[in-house]
């Protein structure tokens, strides 16, 4: 089983880095091969809204006018069985690194063939060869977990990325909050490891 870890953390140490390590270890303990894509270290340009990917509805990965690392990244994602997606929360959303990546996936991993009611051009995943699975991790410095609904758009964004771009069902989420004041809790570390392990226990479906 191949798990791709999508890491939008700009820092290599700290609470989110610890949770990412725990989730990766959990997946490895379950027998998965884990490949980390550290987005901050890769060349990912802003979407230029040229619509090249939007118009390309036939390719396994939508063509892009930019020559950066995204095509290589998307090929790694296409080969995966499952994903660990992690971002710090910034102004309630995924951070700028995550959102740049999110936008670039919309019609490259996704296709414009989707439709909701009478609305056409809705993203739908190109990765239709098998059902994939995902878990998400978000960290926040100020907002406590019990007030998560007030600021955690990041988890919603990660779940949308999983479903619309990667054809992945999100089977678990973690939001670790109030880290600036109370630090990382042991229960969140355990939860992260459990999330990673849970990916290896999901039933593969064509």
What do the PLM-derived regions correspond to, one by one?
Residues 49, 98-102, 127, 133, ...:
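Phenylalanine-focused residue identity feature
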Residues 171-176:
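Beta-strand-loop-alpha "switch" segments that mediate conformational coupling across diverse proteins
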């Amino acid at each position: 089983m191949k798990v791709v870890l999508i890491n939008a953390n700009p820092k290599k140490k700290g609470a989110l880095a610890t949770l990412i390590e725990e989730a990766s270890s959990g997946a490895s303990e379950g027998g998965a091969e884990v490949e980390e894509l550290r987005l901050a270290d890769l060349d990912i340009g802003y979407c230029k809204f040229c619509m090249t990917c939007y118009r390309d509805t036939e390719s396994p990965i939508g063509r892009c006018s930019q020559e950066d690392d995204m095509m290589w990244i998307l090929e790694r994602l296409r080969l995966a069985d499952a994903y660990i997606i992690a971002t710090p929360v910034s102004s309630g959303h995924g951070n700028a690194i995550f959102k740049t990546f999110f936008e670039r996936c919309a019609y490259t991993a996704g296709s414009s063939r989707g439709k909701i009611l009478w609305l056409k051009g809705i993203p739908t995943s190109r990765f239709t060869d098998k059902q994939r699975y995902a878990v998400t991790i978000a960290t926040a410095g100020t907002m406590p977990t019990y007030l998560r609904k007030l600021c955690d758009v990041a988890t919603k964004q990660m779940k949308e990325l999983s479903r619309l771009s990667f054809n992945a069902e999100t089977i678990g989420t973690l939001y670790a909050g109030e880290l600036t004041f109370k630090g990382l809790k042991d229960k969140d570390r355990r939860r992260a490891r459990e999330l990673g392990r849970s990916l290896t226990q999901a039933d593969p479906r064509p």
